[in-house]
Amino acid sequence: MKHKAVKELLRWSLMVFLSVSAVVAVSILMNGMYLLGIPDPEDVRSIVAEYPGVTDEKKEFTDREHVEQAVKLTGFLRYALFEEPVSGGSSMITITYVLDDGRTVSVSADRETVWWKGRPRAIKDREMFVNLAEGIFFLEEVSRP
């Protein structure tokens, strides 16, 4: 009796695992893969935002609101796993996270490609990251004629 209950539990666990795996795989294929390794907002001391096409000034933010927004902004950099990035582009916006331990982590993107850990990847939701970063960090510079 006990052996049969264990078999049923294992069978049920396998079905749950396979179902969850299928849902996650379809979600990644449809919506894109999140960047892995983005720091937690609590571990970030400050961020430096750069937009060379608009201003030569590097903007540093230490307030919690901008730090949290910068970390959350990377959620719009989901990339297509099996799509080749557009070649020949250069980054428009770079966000550098300065961590509490002094290390830095940078992510760069243009409208179609994200550069993360030295590798270019095709952005699934094009335009969104650049538009939001302009509005959050460079609104004054972008709105000038």
Predicted regions and their residues:
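Function-determining sites in protein domains
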Residues: 2-145
